[in-house]
Structures are given as C-alpha cells and as structure tokens.
Amino acid sequence: MAGSAPEALLVGLGAIPGAWLRLKVVNHFEPMVPKKHWGTLLVNVISSFALGLVLALDETCSASSGIALLMGVGFFGTLSTFSTFVVELLNELRAGHLLAAAALAVISIVAGLIAAAAGYGLGAYG
C-alpha cells in the first residue's frame, strides 16, 4: 500500500494546515524581531517534539499508521522547515555574521534534538 492514493490523501490533508500554520507563525515573529530566525526556530522545535511523539506512539500503539502519515509526514512535516533554516544560516554567513550563524546552527540542532527526544520519551514512556 506504499504510495497509495489514500496515503497521499492523508499526507495532503495534514500538509495544508501545517504549511498554513508555519506561514502564520513565521509572519507573526517577522515584525517583532529584525531577523526571521525566531519563527523558524519555533516551528522547527515544535515539529521536532511532535514528530518524536508521533514516532513513539506509532511504534508503541496499535494505532493505524494513518495518524503518522496525517500528522507526522503531513502536518508536522510541513510545519517544520529545514530549507528555510539553511537559507537563514546561509544569509548570516554571507553577511559575515559567523558567530550568529554558529549560534543559530547550534541552537537549532540542539533544541530540535532535545525536543524530539522529549516528544519521543513522552510518547514511549509517558
């Protein structure tokens, strides 16, 4: 059933609100701070937590993998944005802001990893 129409529909149904919410969150932070990093960081950390949770629940529960497709791949997959993070990092490097770029990279990766582990722990053991 991999790649079937019902699976694609589940992913698509989750993707639309996930992408819309990402746009809203990132645009909300844009006027408050001179750089867009905070909105991107927030959606990526929230998505990392949620994906960890969905993964753990999918592994430990007898629930249908449809939830993992709808929420994990669809909603939280489009809420998060690795490509925007990388472009923001590149812009910092191009501007010569090496310390800001390093801080952005470290904070994003460490916070995302902690969030994913916390979500997974909650789903698996909580």
Swiss-Prot record:
Cellular compartments annotated: Cell inner membrane
Domain of life: Bacteria
Record's catalysed reaction(s): fluoride(in) = fluoride(out)
Binding site for Na(+): G77, S80
Major subcellular location class: membrane
GO MF term (any one): metal ion binding
Family matches, as Pfam families: CRCB
4Fe-4S in keyword set: no
Activity control note: Na(+) is not transported, but it plays an essential structural role and its presence is essential for fluoride channel function.
Membrane topology classification: Multi-pass membrane protein
Transmembrane regions: 37-57, 67-87, 98-118
Keywords attached to this entry: Cell inner membrane, Cell membrane, Ion channel, Ion transport, Membrane, Metal-binding, Sodium, Transmembrane, Transmembrane helix, Transport
Any Gene Ontology CC annotation: plasma membrane
A biological process from GO: cellular detoxification of fluoride
Family recorded in the similarity comment: Belongs to the fluoride channel Fluc/FEX (TC 1.A.43) family.
HAMAP family found in the cross-reference section: FluC
Function: Fluoride-specific ion channel. Important for reducing fluoride concentration in the cell, thus reducing its toxicity.
Descriptive protein name: Fluoride-specific ion channel FluC 1
Organism name: Parasynechococcus marenigrum (strain WH8102)
Name of the gene: fluC1
